[in-house]
A protein has these predicted regions:
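Alpha-helical protein-protein interaction modules
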Residues: 9, 17, 24-28, 40, ...
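A generic tandem-repeat structural signature
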Residues: 27, 35-52
Length: 203
């Protein structure tokens, strides 16, 4: 967890592969001591998802969920994996439950991340109206949310240039490497990934 935070906040000079290898090694050691440690399975699920190993991400997410089915962090992590692997209804059920149980996650000051997870889920469900509805509950946009919301607006034939997301895109993210950014969305379907990348690069 600490290694992941260091990487995403820019506090580590190690490259991504080194950090993930070290994180996995540490978690594996912890699992050797206690194979029923749900935190280890939860974190391994996240590590495998980041490496696009969706089978193992789902496997460890399920193990954590079976141990503590009402932990919001487990619900959120496992739900994120399921919506990506085609089990959208179940994934959304878990993401909505995480939001209901713990709308503002520990250590955070808003419900943005929970809502962004729901945006991801409803995007995969192709419920574009719900994606746009949720967009108004996000206070700080990130590249993933911008791409998913703008894509959803386009599917609803809305004027993109009038949206908050378009303005943030042009002011804060105009230099974004979208190939790299979309890869970090960890989308299993190559068709969906390509369509989204083509769309956002053309906006």
């Amino acid at each position: 967890c600490t290694l992941g935070q260091a990487m995403f906040r820019g506090f580590s000079d190690q490259n991504t592969e080194e950090i993930f290898a070290e994180a996995k090694e540490n978690i594996d050691k912890a699992l050797e001591l206690n194979e029923n440690d749900f935190e280890c399975h939860r974190m391994l699920s996240a590590v495998y998802l980041s490496n696009h190993d969706y089978v193992l991400a789902e496997d460890h997410g399920k193990k954590a969920f079976n141990m503590v089915p009402n932990d919001p962090r487990v619900l959120s992590g496992y739900g994120e994996v399921l919506v990506r692997t085609g089990k959208v209804d179940k994934g959304l059920e878990l993401l909505n439950k995480a939001y209901e149980l713990d709308p503002i996650p520990q250590g955070q000051s808003s419900s943005d991340n929970r809502v962004k997870d729901l945006v991801l889920g409803y995007f995969f469900a192709e419920d574009y109206n719900k994606v746009v509805e949720l967009s108004f509950d996000i206070s700080v946009m990130d590249p993933r949310s911008i791409a998913l919301i703008l894509y959803s607006r386009s599917q609803l034939k809305q004027d993109l240039e009038m949206s908050k997301e378009y303005k943030v895109l042009k002011s804060d993210y105009k230099e974004t490497d979208w190939t790299q950014a979309v890869d970090r969305f960890h989308i299993q379907s190559e068709d969906i990934r390509k369509n989204l990348l083509e769309f956002i690069e053309g906006v």
